[in-house]
Amino acid sequence: MTELSTLYRPVGQAEFELVRDSDFRSFPPRLPHQPIFYPVIDEQYATQIARDWNTKDETSGFVGYVLRFSVRTEFLSHYEIHIVGSSEHQEYWIPAENLQKLNENIVGPIEVVSEFRDK
């Protein structure tokens, strides 16, 4: 049986709509100024970003979503986990050119865990 890892992705409105348009099966290509795709390991960290940052950001539409998805662990084994701040701020740095390969290794649908809006 294939081993899976659960990851989280905090996104704003535009990225959420693109994921939704894929029937919650894949993440959209990165923009030219976004060379890295950053999925995070901890739901709490993803929630912090979606709630505390995305809801204050105009380019996120003042909305933050936390998405959860499962990826084949074998795919992730080619990437290091980076700690960016405190010990629970752990994320993978996947180069934009490898995002399609990540999408091919997602198992099942991408799920919406939570939604936050600026008050």
Regions found by a protein language model. Give the residues of each.
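ADP-ribose/NAD+-binding catalytic cleft of ART/PARP-like enzymes
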Residues: 1-33, 67, 71, 110-115
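ADP-ribosyltransferase catalytic core
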Residues: 4, 25-37, 41-93
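Short, surface-exposed beta-strand/loop "edge" segments at domain boundaries and coil↔beta transitions
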Residues: 14-19, 73-79, 99-102
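Generic surface-pattern signal
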Residues: 21-24, 51-58, 104-118
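Active-site and NAD+-binding cores of ADP-ribose-processing enzymes
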Residues: 78-119
